[in-house]
From Swiss-Prot:
Gene Ontology terms: biological process: antimicrobial humoral immune response mediated by antimicrobial peptide; chemotaxis; defense response to Gram-negative bacterium; defense response to Gram-positive bacterium; induction of bacterial agglutination; innate immune response in mucosa
Record protein name field: Eosinophil cationic protein
Molecular function terms, GO-annotated: endonuclease activity; lipopolysaccharide binding; nucleic acid binding; RNA nuclease activity
Species per Swiss-Prot/TrEMBL record: Gorilla gorilla gorilla
Pfam families in alphabetical order: RnaseA (PF00074)
Signal peptide: 1-27
Gene3D superfamilies found in the cross-reference section: Ribonuclease A-like domain
Entry annotation: catalytic residues: 42, 155
Length: 160
């Protein structure tokens, strides 16, 4: 009985440790609000090629992000989408704070093509431009955000 309990406790600790690592890979850097991090990751009127554009994000994350989408629009335009009817988020069905854009926007989707890269300076991406609708999760602004926008985008849920 004791060895089983001990083994179970070790398995639980390993599982919790892995969940913590996975969570930290998706966490925003602490110096940014959720809206600021959203803007860094997903807003660019004229993004350069993906390999260059992703360097900024990867430098904060200390690893190669598997994929990312840059919306070629302004932060203010995405904030306006937050005023659209609330819908259930498509990727996280437990959230009801998502909003779908009414218009397609130009975008650039980046896919990591060398997932085994050991150094973030070696991350390479394939560029996939497109024009799609998008769904964003929105929340009340953080105190550090500009009071100009009471509700701000905090997560790009999907593109359609």
């Amino acid at each position: 009985m004791v060895p089983k309990l001990f083994t179970s406790q070790i398995c639980l600790l390993l599982l919790l440790g892995l969940m913590g690592v996975e969570g930290s890979l998706h966490a925003r850097p602490p110096q940014f609000t959720r809206a600021q991090w959203f803007a860094i990751q997903h807003i660019s009127l004229n993004p350069p090629r993906c390999t260059i554009a992703m360097r900024v994000i990867n430098n904060y994350r200390w690893r190669c992000k598997n994929q990312n989408t840059f919306l070629r629009t302004t932060f203010a335009n995405v904030v306006n989408v937050c005023g659209n009817q609330s819908i259930r988020c498509l990727h996280n069905r437990t959230l009801n704070n998502c909003h779908r854009s009414r218009f397609r926007v130009p975008l650039l989707h980046c896919d990591l093509i060398n997932p085994g890269a050991q150094n973030i300076s070696n991350c390479r991406y394939a560029d996939r431009p497109g024009r799609r609708f998008y769904v964003v999760a929105c929340d009340n602004r953080d105190p550090q955000d500009s009071p100009r926008y009471p509700v701000v985008p905090v997560h790009l849920d999907t593109t359609i």
